[in-house]
Curated annotation (Swiss-Prot):
Its main location: virion. Homomultimerizes to form the nucleocapsid. May bind host exportin-1/XPO1. Binds to viral genomic RNA. Protein-RNA contacts are mediated by a combination of electrostatic interactions between positively charged residues and the phosphate backbone and planar interactions between aromatic side chains and bases. Residues 1-21 are annotated as: Disordered. The gene is NP. A motif (Unconventional nuclear localization signal) lies at residues 1-18. Late in virus-infected cells, may be cleaved from a 56-kDa protein to a 53-kDa protein by a cellular caspase. This cleavage might be a marker for the onset of apoptosis in infected cells or have a specific function in virus host interaction. Keywords: Capsid protein, Helical capsid protein, Host nucleus, Host-virus interaction, Ribonucleoprotein, RNA-binding, Viral nucleoprotein, Viral penetration into host nucleus, Virion, Virus entry into host cell. GO terms for biological process: symbiont entry into host cell; viral penetration into host nucleus. This is Nucleoprotein. InterPro entries: Flu_NP (IPR002141). One of its GO terms (molecular function) is RNA binding. A motif (Bipartite nuclear localization signal) lies at residues 198-216.
């Protein structure tokens, strides 16, 4: 990307840091995940969890959610001002699963938020360590991306459910900062903007007064984030139009939906980071690994290496397939929900199947599910190779877009073609090229029409052996060119509901 110079790297976003060199970045990311690990160990001690219980991904998620809730200033304030029956605004908790007499038992725990904040700060050298909190949010977001489909949310905002590959990070909370904005897909940003515009249409005062001024600033900031994800001049120019609109209405919604569709071929740059569950960092810290001294990167070999020697368990429902549960967790760990299955399968070393063929439900277990029949199994999170996570979207030939398929947003920087059904996508662009954005629309459609499904993206990029930590010998896989690689193809997953 041309504007690379103005951007901070992910790690800088992740750690809130100013310009740092590679070593400093590795150290500060290491400090961040080390803090998460120390916090997790301390929580296991507080809760008197056995080694096996501490490695249970469901327990990890409960502990992560507790600390996120303890630091959710806005919600805490809201809860204190609007007391609801049976909810103590000063407490947080969730289900903890314990092994008793050969069975798994659920225990609901409750903690003072103040106490959780104290433990978190203590694990992070007395600091609030917001970067670590964002990291946990992104892990939860990646898990949601792999587990649920957002068809209903897409349809509600007037978008096409086939645009699901653009929806990375759609469940991230608003307070996830720059690191959160980097991992949001084009569709996610478009959906947030459309919701905002719709509120403005229905509520006259939304853009007015002191509050309206703040709203307007937020609107323009979101427009700029989305603009920064687009890689062609025409798409960016259209975003300028949307941003500068005097009072945003249906014309802007139309433009945004057009841009979202165009991103299926002229893909946006969306960051990918391997964010692992807290228990994985905890295990490493407990075994004496010093993250800050060794350094750590979210986009290189480190997460792969960490997963190679971490044993994590998951609760399994009676008719679920443990191998499928592992695939879900693996995809979440590597932020690969929207990656081409051919690439994921090659890296993982076992076939990654589309979600419609998975016999597994989500990782989290509802409070009304019967624990009597629950079993646990080891999650297989290891990989055969590792690859660098990308943020380019695979459009390496700048102005002329490369191919994109309905439903791929590349995660790994690995050479492949991005097959797509041009007819399906282009059918969505019927006629409407009048109005202020007509020349940009025409230009965007022209670029989309010239894209070829057989074009290679990430030329010369390959995967690496796990012993090759400096990425010296890329192995460039060859893929069956015609093969569709979409995870959401023929999908029957449940909807994500808050």
């Amino acid at each position: 990307m041309a504007s690379q110079g103005t951007k901070r790297s992910y790690e800088q976003m992740e750690t809130g840091g100013e310009r740092q060199n590679a070593t400093e970045i590795r150290a500060s990311v290491g400090r961040m995940v080390g803090g998460i690990g120390r916090f997790y160990i301390q929580m296991c001690t507080e809760l008197k969890l056995s080694d096996h219980e501490g490695r249970l991904i469901q327990n990890s998620i409960t502990i992560e959610r507790m600390v996120l809730s303890a630091f959710d200033e806005r919600r805490n304030k809201y809860l204190e001002e609007h007391p609801s029956a049976g909810k103590d605004p000063k407490k947080t908790g969730g289900p903890i699963y314990r092994r008793r007499d050969g069975k798994w038992m659920r225990e609901l725990i409750l903690y003072d938020k103040e106490e959780i904040r104290r433990i978190w700060r203590q694990a992070n050298n007395g600091e609030d360590a917001t970067a670590g909190l964002t990291h946990l949010m992104i892990w939860h977001s990646n898990l949601n991306d792999a587990t649920y489909q957002r068809t209903r949310a897409l349809v509600r905002t007037g978008m096409d459910p086939r645009m699901c590959s653009l929806m990375q990070g759609s469940t991230l909370p608003r307070r996830s900062g720059a690191a959160g904005a980097a991992v949001k897909g084009v569709g996610t940003m478009v959906m947030e903007l459309i919701r905002m515009i719709k509120r403005g249409i229905n509520d006259r005062n939304f853009w007015r007064g002191e509050n309206g001024r703040r709203t307007r600033i937020a609107y323009e900031r979101m427009c700029n984030i989305l603009k920064g994800k687009f890689q062609t001049a025409a798409q960016r120019a259209m975003m300028d139009q949307v941003r500068e609109s005097r009072n945003p209405g249906n014309a802007e919604i139309e433009d945004l939906i057009f841009l979202a569709r165009s991103a299926l071929i002229l893909r946006g740059s969306v960051a990918h980071k391997s964010c692992l569950p807290a228990c994985v960092y905890g295990l490493a810290v407990a075994s004496g690994y010093d993250f800050e001294r060794e350094g750590y990167s979210l986009v290189g070999i480190d997460p792969f290496r960490l997963l190679q020697n971490s044993q994590v368990f998951s609760l399994i429902r009676p008719n679920e397939n443990p191998a499928h549960k592992s695939q879900l967790a693996w995809m979440a760990c590597h932020s690969a929900a929207f990656e081409d299955l051919r690439v994921s399968s090659f890296i993982r070393g076992t076939r990654v199947v589309p979600r419609g063929q998975l016999s597994t439900r989500g990782v989290q277990i509802a409070s009304n599910e019967n624990m009597e029949t629950m079993d646990s199994s080891t999650l297989e999170l290891r990989s055969r190779y590792w690859a660098i996570r990308t943020r380019s979207g695979g459009n390496n030939n700048q102005q002329r877009a490369s191919a994109g398929q309905i439903s791929v947003q590349p995660t790994f920087s690995v050479q492949r073609n991005l097959p797509f059904e041009r007819a399906t996508i282009m059918a969505a662009f019927t006629g409407n090229t009048e109005g202020r954005t007509s020349d940009m629309r025409t230009e965007i459609i022209r670029m989309m029409e010239s894209a070829r499904p057989e074009d290679l993206s990430f030329q010369g990029r390959g995967v690496f052996e796990l012993s090759d930590e400096n990425a010296t010998n890329p192995i460039v896989p060859s893929f069956d060119m015609s093969n569709e690689g979409s995870y959401f193809f023929g999908d029957n997953a449940e909807e994500y509901d808050n």
